[in-house]
Amino acid sequence: MPKLYIIAGCNGAGKTTASYTVLPEMLGCKEFVNADEIAKGLSPFNPESVAIEAGRLMLQRMDDLLSEGSDFAFETTLSTRSYVKFIERAQAKGYFVTLLYFWLPTPEQAIERVATRVREGGHNIPSDVIRRRYANGIKNLTALYIPLCNYWAIYDNSSADEQIRIIALGGKDITTHIEDTLSYKTVSYTHLRAHETLAN
């Protein structure tokens, strides 16, 4: 059975860093499709200028890998519904879809993480964009993507010592197991609060 891994979380959550460890060492997945890395390849000194082209190339590569039936992973903030149909297509082709979500407790921590990345030479993302993606990502995580994926896990990646903690896991045929009740309730509460904010 081919495998699709979705590495998700807000900007600054440590998705890319975690994926380079988790994917090859723990999951045996060598193919990681990342629009940010594609953009760096196209324009190393100004990756933001080629973001649209990088996104297009990312989607094309994902389609190619899906057609080949290869195992692969991609990175996303889940801030839009755009991957729902792609996941459904993958499952129709027999893929087992795993969602790994790296969570930060607040958008402020995400903003600070991105600011640190910029100071170290990384690419910038405006604070208002980070806040919007943070709220939309958690809303879509709970409302759309968790019910859709075959297996999911939420991790707390907020620790300064880079220790990733499991919050909860579950799946279509897996009973939900909550390891950190307080954090899991916080994720759920953040989703409800984000839904109210977006509705107003």
Question: What positions do the PLM features span?
Answer:
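NTP-dependent small-molecule kinase module
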Residues: 143-193
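Post-Walker A alpha-helix
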Residues: 18-19
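Conserved small/polar residues in nucleotide/adenosyl-binding loops
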Residues: 114, 190-197
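A glycine- and Lys/Arg-enriched "phosphate-lid" helix/loop adjacent to the NTP-binding pocket
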Residues: 95-144
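Conserved substrate/cofactor phosphate-moiety recognition/catalytic segment
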Residues: 23-68
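Glycine-rich phosphate-binding loop used to anchor ATP phosphates in small-molecule kinases
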Residues: 53-101
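Conserved lysine of the Walker
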Residues: 15
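The conserved Walker
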Residues: 11
